[in-house]
């Protein structure tokens, strides 16, 4: 008889094969739930709603350091992005370069979220803009946020204002009360209020005019492709059934292989149609998204270093503190 486990993740091409059953975990019956990550992380950190769940890497490090031992991390990495390249600014703000963010009012959905961690890290290490140089305005409330579930307090020397419940990052960007925003989503959920499409608004633009070019520049210089979300499992399940960890990892490897095959087929069709250059064929076949500790150690350790630097954790979190011991050599 298979072991039934509830699992929750956000829908994307690399997780959907788990949801639709094309990628199965041996010996496990997965009861899959697709949940927006902002709500998912709050519910898991607050209520432990699922046996296995996608999880913010930043929030997991914070929870573990604070003594929350309910979960253990799995090095299954579902989303990545060059987050700093997508900072939004008002066109009339006079913000033309990252250095211009100093002294400005900047909105963030949640200060401790991994996307904001990476954005602040890039601003500081690439452009000399410290979190202490910015006045932050946070949308999520203490009762409905990852930080509310982990006891978040603004780091020393950093100004983090709470946005009133009748406002949001989106509304304050349009009113001019905010001049810039980090990792803006514009999708209302159980914990998010912003709903305005700022990316297509005539008064708003990205700080970096060519977001793809900035991502390429950053990657070529640093070798970092920032990880946003991983997975976690209830510690009691992992300890009672240690085989589950590797079977879950194999299932997500299968899901990733399906996604890669579909991506390559789509790219091939676009090349044949003249929508992509021939040079894209080799680039798109390179496997840049991998699971496991070994392939991602530099990225994970950089995130841990940023967490310490930014005052989210008070000690440098070792990967051994966060992830299952049996995965450390994978």
Placement of each model-derived feature along the sequence:
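Basic/polar N-terminal segments that are highly enriched at the extreme N-terminus
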Residues: 1-5, 153, 330
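Secondary-structure end/capping motifs
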Residues: 232, 237-309
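Beta-rich nucleic-acid/ligand-interaction surfaces
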Residues: 143-147, 153, 324-329
């Amino acid at each position: 008889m298979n072991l039934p486990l509830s699992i929750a993740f956000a829908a994307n091409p690399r997780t959907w094969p788990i949801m639709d059953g094309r990628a199965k975990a041996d010996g496990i019956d997965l009861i899959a739930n697709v949940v927006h990550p902002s709500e998912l992380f709050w519910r898991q950190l607050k209520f432990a709603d699922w046996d296995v769940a996608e999880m913010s890497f930043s929030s997991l490090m914070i929870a573990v350091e604070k003594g929350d031992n309910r979960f253990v991390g799995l090095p299954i990495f579902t989303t990545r992005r060059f987050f700093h390249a997508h900072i939004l600014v008002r066109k009339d703000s006079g913000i033309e370069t990252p250095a211009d963010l100093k002294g400005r009012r900047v909105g963030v959905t949640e200060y401790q979220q991994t996307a904001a961690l990476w954005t602040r890290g890039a601003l500081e290490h690439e452009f000399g803009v410290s979190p202490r140089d910015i006045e932050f305005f946070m949308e999520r409330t203490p009762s409905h946020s990852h930080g509310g579930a982990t006891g978040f307090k603004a780091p020393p020397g950093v100004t983090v204002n709470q946005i009133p419940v009748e406002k949001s990052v989106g509304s304050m960007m349009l009113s001019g009360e905010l001049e810039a925003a980090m990792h803006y989503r514009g999708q209302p959920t159980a914990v998010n209020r912003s709903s305005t499409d700022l990316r297509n608004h005539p008064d708003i633009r990205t700080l970096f005019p060519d977001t793809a070019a900035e991502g390429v520049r950053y990657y070529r210089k640093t070798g970092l492709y920032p990880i946003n979300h991983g997975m976690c499992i209830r510690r009691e399940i992992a300890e009672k059934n240690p085989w589950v960890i590797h079977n879950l990892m194999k299932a997500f490897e299968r899901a990733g292989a399906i996604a890669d095959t579909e991506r390559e087929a789509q790219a091939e069709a676009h090349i044949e149609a003249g929508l992509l250059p021939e040079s894209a064929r080799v680039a798109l076949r390179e496997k840049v998204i991998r699971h496991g500790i070994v392939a991602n150690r530099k990225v994970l350790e950089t995130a841990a270093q940023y967490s310490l630097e930014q005052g989210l954790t008070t000690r440098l979190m070792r990967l051994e503190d966060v992830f299952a011991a049996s995965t450390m050599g994978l």
